[in-house]
């Protein structure tokens, strides 16, 4: 049975999710989209993408819909989710990717509008649960989890390697830095922003800013609560990021033992989520990689019981594929 999906917010993640469904899923079908932008613009941005390239199917539009490969997708432009008629399209799951309805108390309006489940594509508040596929997805409970979060792209990178390393060696405490591609929340030129660092031109600066990813790991790995913190360095690349984690273990380890633990996990139960590489990667090498986390074995460093590791991630496509896996899990339990 095909599960019917609605997307609220047809921006970077919304459009990437649409592409991921087309490319990778036989079980999901996007039947409706809500975005305040006009349909001509939405169809153009779906058809042509500066990172992903041209969509391999014909895209057309009219006043009420976008048609992709001959399939019509209804399009709405409602500011308030409660005014959406998901029921009219038999929508089962809504991907909430506007960035505005990260409070589950607001996002549950999608359920009131006819959907069965809501997945927020960002860190959330008041959600029923937060999941990183491959880390804690097996705790998903369809009876009690109706509005859930797929966490952030950085948490989806950090959590898989943190789980493996904590289970194997024990993380006492640690600090992380994500070297992160710039995003739409930054300014192209110097211009006002509530974060004065993000107010500076994104394409010519390294921009230090906050990330909640380290603390959010505790939502999917409670055993690490209070043990990790960190920040982000936004850099002038359009996508392709890396998470640097430095941590202390309970006993001395070696580069070889750290890498072996990750490699074993990557070829085993974490295969879709966590990859292991001994190649001399740079950021463009991992663009359009579907893993949430791509461990770079050549960058592992050890001094006594202090360890530094790095994992890459395509902060758009890799995260979207993680979101797709989570959506397929939810769909399988409807």
Curated annotation (Swiss-Prot):
Transmembrane segments: none annotated. Gene3D superfamilies: Dihydrodipicolinate Reductase, domain 2, NAD(P)-binding Rossmann-like Domain. Pathway: Carbohydrate degradation; glycolysis; pyruvate from D-glyceraldehyde 3-phosphate: step 1/5. One of its GO terms (biological process) is glycolytic process. It holds the Pfam family Gp_dh_C. The active site is at residue 153. Its main location: cytoplasm. It catalyses: D-glyceraldehyde 3-phosphate + phosphate + NAD(+) = (2R)-3-phospho-glyceroyl phosphate + NADH + H(+). The record marks 180 as: Activates thiol group during catalysis. SMART domains: Gp_dh_N. Belongs to the glyceraldehyde-3-phosphate dehydrogenase family. Homotetramer. This is Glyceraldehyde-3-phosphate dehydrogenase.
């Amino acid at each position: 049975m095909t599960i019917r999906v609605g997307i609220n917010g047809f921006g970077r993640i919304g459009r990437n999710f649409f592409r991921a469904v087309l490319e990778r899923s036989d079980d999901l079908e996007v039947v409706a989209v809500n975005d305040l932008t006009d349909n001509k613009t939405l169809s153009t941005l779906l058809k042509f993408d500066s990172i992903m390239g041209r969509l391999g199917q014909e895209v057309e539009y009219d006043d009420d819909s976008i048609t992709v490969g001959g399939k019509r997708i209804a399009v709405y432009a409602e500011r308030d989710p409660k005014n959406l008629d998901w029921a009219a399209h038999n929508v089962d799951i809504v991907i909430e990717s506007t960035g505005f309805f990260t409070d589950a108390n607001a996002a549950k309006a999608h359920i009131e509008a006819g959907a069965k489940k809501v997945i927020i594509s960002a860190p959330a508040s008041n959600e029923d649960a937060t999941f990183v596929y491959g880390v804690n997805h097996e705790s998903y409970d369809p009876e009690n989890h109706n509005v859930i979060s797929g966490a952030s792209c950085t948490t989806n990178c950090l959590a898989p390697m943190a789980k493996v390393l904590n289970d194997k060696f024990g993380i006492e405490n640690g600090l992380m830095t994500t070297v992160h591609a710039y995003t739409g929340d930054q300014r192209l030129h110097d211009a006002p922003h509530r974060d004065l660092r993000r107010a500076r031109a994104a394409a010519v600066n390294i921009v230090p800013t906050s990330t909640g990813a380290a603390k959010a790991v505790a939502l999917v790995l409670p055993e690490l609560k209070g043990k990790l913190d960190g920040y982000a360095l936004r850099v002038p690349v359009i996508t392709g990021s890396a998470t640097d984690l430095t941590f202390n273990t309970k006993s001395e380890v070696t580069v070889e033992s750290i890498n072996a633990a990750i490699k074993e996990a990557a070829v085993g139960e974490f295969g879709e989520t966590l990859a292991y590489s001994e190649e001399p990667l740079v950021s463009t090498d991992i663009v359009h990689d579907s893993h949430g986390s791509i461990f770079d074995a050549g960058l592992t460093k050890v001094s006594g019981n202090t360890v530094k590791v790095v994992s890459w991630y395509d902060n758009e496509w890799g995260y979207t594929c993680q979101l797709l896996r989570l959506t397929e899990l939810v769909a399988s339990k409807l």
